[in-house]
Amino acid sequence: MAKLIAFDQDAREGILRGVDALANAVKVTLGPRGRNVVLDKAFGGPLVTNDGVTIARDIDLEDPFENLGAQLVKSVAVKTNDIAGDGTTTATLLAQALIAEGLRNVAAGANPMELNKGISAAAEKTLEELKARATEVSDTKEIANVATVSSRDEVVGEIVAAAMEKVGKDGVVTVEESQSIETALEVTEGISFDKGYLSPYFINDNDTQQAVLDNPAVLLVRNKISSLPDFLPLLEKVVESNRPLLIIAEDVEGEPLQTLVVNSIRKTIKVVAVKSPYFGDRRKAFMDDLAIVTKATVVDPEVGINLNEAGEEVFGTARRITVSKDETIIVDGAGSAEDVEARRGQIRREIANTDSTWDREKAEERLAKLSGGIAVIRVGAATETEVNDRKLRVEDAINAARAAAQEGVIAGGGSALVQIAETLKAYAEEFEGDQKVGVRALATALGKPAYWIASNAGLDGSVVVARTAALPNGEGFNAATLEYGNLINDGVIDPVKVTHSAVVNATSVARMVLTTEASVVEKPAEEAADAHAGHHHH
């Protein structure tokens, strides 16, 4: 492939245009009075959403130099979403503002390396300030506030808070579509563990990047599955019965894995393979727990059950299983409540009888997994477009609520960042030259989220930012009521974890862009295609 190369100012300007294109599409959604964006989907109706990361994921630009910029900022949104699950719009905006500020200074002759030192120091300072301003979140009402701000929907806020209360702040909360138009919460028996799919080809729900299996056959295998002849007879039985299949084994490798991937791509069978979690005896014990939850029999040569002889009697099942990149959630396993309770009793006895603290901790962890239960929020709405939009909001709300419970909250509406920016301006005096410019660049960028929240509400952003800067910690502008006041009491709050990861990811990408001296892209394909056509004139 031929490449195109741009240097210096050209390279950076192309990147900036791409950054702006993506960020401008995302920033209209910011704040309680933010607007929606409509995404055209190849399948099904268009998606109307105000979820920053969903919009960002959908954007690819035609101009390859601009697309580099768009993809860089997209990575900020996606990364922030992975870590904190929310705050993607804020992260995107911060990155855009920092890149624009920084490039302006580079064009005016500032040294990018020195600028970066300033930005790094300012980012460190910002994170310290965020920690210092954090308030702990304890009661359900505060959690409901966080979830409400995130989803802009009080009903969702209350349901998410109720779910967190039932399963604890580390408990599993999943989102499903409801059959009715009501959104409701139910707590079901379920178990989850931190291992995801062995291959991304198993994903069957592209929106959530998960593999979702309804009423699947569950195959638990003690050892590795590495021989195809041993494994094929059982696989064929599943294909015949037309059921989805979840395989949990020490590992699935070589030909068996290839076979599963190929069949998954061809849609011959809905299948997901997952490595069993933990090691040694812990792995063994946990597999036995799973067997009881799903009513499966573990395929284990030690007890005389070989893979090549096993039939459908070894399968367990569950109502629904979702597998993401690093987590598997089994909801409503087929195991009877009595069996599961008996298993819990057995683990409780183990806890009582052991002298080792480590063993006790691990057994308690298993007990918690077995008794935790899983909260399922069933999302209902009148149309499919609305259901999809609401599902995204509920997922954001769950992530925000969990982040708040873990690391506390700060005043929302971008106000805490505006006030931290004031601290940075004073902090900048400790620096010289271009490093000072770098610290100030971040201070300017930190004002942008509040600016756009006010702008989207139809007010003059700069006036709001200037007034907010003078207010004490915890106070700021409430765009929902259009008044200034104590945001923490009004429930306008953001999880520290979300804002923290937004700042970290935005500054890291901005620093990369500022030090870019050349960009290399593939030459667009149309021209190449025409060139080939020229060879056929005999």
Swiss-Prot record:
Cellular compartment(s): Cytoplasm
UniProt entry keywords in alphabetical sequence: ATP-binding, Chaperone, Cytoplasm, Isomerase, Nucleotide-binding
CDD domains per the UniProt record, alphabetical: GroEL
One Gene Ontology term from the biological process aspect of the record: protein refolding
Binding, ATP: 29-32, 86-90, 413, 478-480, 494
Keyword Nucleotide-binding recorded: yes
Any one GO molecular function term: isomerase activity
Pfam families, per database record: Cpn60_TCP1
Keyword Hydrolase set for record: no
EC numbers for this chain: 5.6.1.7
Domain of life, per lineage: Bacteria
Uppermost EC category: isomerase
GO cellular component terms attached to this protein's record: cytoplasm
SUPFAM superfamilies: GroEL apical domain-like (SSF52029), GroEL equatorial domain-like (SSF48592)
Catalytic activity, reaction form: ATP + H2O + a folded polypeptide = ADP + phosphate + an unfolded polypeptide
Family: Belongs to the chaperonin (HSP60) family.
UniProt subunit comment: Forms a cylinder of 14 subunits composed of two heptameric rings stacked back-to-back. Interacts with the co-chaperonin GroES.
Function: Together with its co-chaperonin GroES, plays an essential role in assisting protein folding. The GroEL-GroES system forms a nano-cage that allows encapsulation of the non-native substrate proteins and provides a physical environment optimized to promote and accelerate protein folding.
Name of the protein: Chaperonin GroEL 1
Source organism of the structure: Corynebacterium glutamicum (strain ATCC 13032 / DSM 20300 / JCM 1318 / BCRC 11384 / CCUG 27702 / LMG 3730 / NBRC 12168 / NCIMB 10025 / NRRL B-2784 / 534)
Organism taxonomic ancestry: Bacteria, Bacillati, Actinomycetota, Actinomycetes, Mycobacteriales
Gene this chain is encoded by: groEL1
